Amino acid sequence: MENMTSAILEGLNSEQKAAVSCVDGPVLIVAGAGSGKTRVLTSRIAYILERGGDPSRILALTFTKKAASEMKERIALMVGERKARRLYMGTFHSVFIRFLREFAESLGYPSAFTIYDTSDSISAIKTCLK
């Protein structure tokens, strides 16, 4: 585990290492574009997992599919695909639809449902108005 932890911290500056290795609660990362925020976030998740953290108790949200995909790939390379798959990680939409599907039945709703986009909604309204 020590070698893996060293590999996770390798290449990070002292502030980034401090953020990655702080596992006693949440950390707020505020930095400009291209400063390594995504690298810090993915390294921190890998660091927590390597220290025995439960992947299903980690939530990582991003705005774009591209960023989510990059984060998943980076973490899978650091800790393995099996652990990475168990994370709640992705865009706001993808993560929360996963929550809805996973827990809908326990709330008395079916887990099979469709979310309409604008076009679908307009089409449904037009059908109802006929």
Regions found by a protein language model. Name each.
Residues M1-P110, I115:
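P-loop NTPase Walker
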Residues S119-K130:
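Coupling/switch/interface segments within P-loop NTPase motor domains and analogous charged loops
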